[in-house]
Amino acid sequence: NPEFIRFFYACQYAGLIPVALPASVKVGAHCAYVAQLKQLLEASDAEIGMASEGYLSFLQEASEGLSMRMVDAPEAFHALPFDVQPLHQAEPDDISYIQYTSGSTRFPRGVVIKHRTAMANLHGIVSHGLEMSGSDRMMSWLPFYHDMGLVGFVLVPMAAQISIDYLDTREFAMRPRQWLSLMTKTRATISFAPSFGYDLCARRVRASDIATYDLSNWRVA
């Protein structure tokens, strides 16, 4: 959702600390998901919550009983009265954002990322890891709450000032061949994912589709 990116960077400008919460991936796990969200809201001392239409009801239910100032959809925030405020001057040791671990072996743990750490990491990725140039273009289907999705495909393209195209994670899960179709269409040079993503895509590709793909520009995978 593009609103996530707008709100994430708005928090940076305003001196607020954004925390990306995980999306529900299990069917029929409503209660467990809401309970997890509530624990994350409490652990992060969240005061304001924003969610797109598909997840807003979960977030509002999870926030019940908590002293949060506002939990609503992006449209509600955009409708708030405009007020001129001086921008916060970020310092290197200020907190940039909090990243929660996947929680595959235990409850997700919050990792505090400071601006100094974030910028050093981005410099290393852009200049040395990916060796990026102005001719690069990125493409991703990874969720923004995932470290690889947030750092690799939200922060990196902004830091490097290059274009990026996004495919909704759910769309990829249902039709993984779209990844290759969009790589062909956009001529993207950089797109990477966990190994299961390549496996899922390879298992869904049909022999008759192969001739329609042109991945010759894809240099980092």
Task: Give each language-model segment a name.
Residues 1-9, 26-35, 87-90, 113-116:
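Conserved AMP-binding/adenylate-forming core of the ANL superfamily
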Residues 15, 104, 161:
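Conserved G/P- and acidic residue-centered "switch" motifs that form tight phosphate/ATP-binding loops
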Residues 119-137, 147-189, 200, 204-208:
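Conserved AMP-binding/adenylation subdomain of ANL enzymes
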Residues 49-58, 171, 188-221:
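Adenylate-forming
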Residues 6, 13-81, 194-195, 200:
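Structural core segment of the AMP-binding/adenylate-forming
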Residues 80-107, 117, 121, 129-137:
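Conserved pre-ATP/AMP-binding loop-to-beta segment of ANL
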Residues 38, 87, 176-180, 210-212:
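Short hydrophobic/charged patches on amphipathic alpha-helices used for structural packing
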